[in-house]
């Protein structure tokens, strides 16, 4: 009986330690967004800076590029890819691991400064894509 009790205790402690130290699946997944920039003909637009603002920053400051939470320049395929949006305090238990990011593309067309924006609500671990037509 004593041996059985000792074996059960060791097995139980091993199980508790294993499950307590394992990572959640969502912790392994980075939260990311790809903004696809295209012109009126659907051709990719490269070299455009896109700014990302978390909900608190957007609500407080708006589209002030100096205060952007993240920024990326679109690549040859017109993609501005934001990875690891969950670094920092953007996703917490306070906001139920959810945050709305506003993405703002600043560009010039026909010698005029323009801005196009899109807001995307994300849960921690999401991977979303949105297209912006720059016209």
Give the location of each predicted region.
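Extracellular beta-sheet/turn segments enriched in Thr/Pro/Gly and aliphatic residues
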Residues: 115-135
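Short, acidic Ser/Thr/Gly-rich low-complexity loop/linker segments typical of extracellular
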Residues: 60-87
């Amino acid at each position: 009986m004593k041996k059985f009790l000792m074996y059960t205790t060791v097995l139980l402690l091993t199980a508790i330690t294993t499950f307590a130290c394992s990572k959640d699946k969502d912790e392994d997944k980075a939260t990311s967004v790809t903004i696809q920039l295209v012109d009126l003909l659907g051709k990719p637009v490269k070299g455009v800076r896109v700014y990302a603002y978390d909900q608190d920053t957007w609500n407080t400051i708006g589209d002030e590029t100096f205060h952007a939470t993240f920024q990326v320049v679109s690549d040859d395929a017109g993609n501005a890819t934001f990875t690891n949006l969950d670094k920092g305090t953007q996703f917490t238990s306070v906001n139920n691991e959810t945050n709305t990011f506003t993405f703002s593309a600043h560009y010039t067309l026909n010698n005029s400064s323009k801005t196009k924006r899109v807001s995307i609500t994300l849960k921690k671990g999401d991977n979303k894509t949105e297209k912006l037509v720059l016209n």
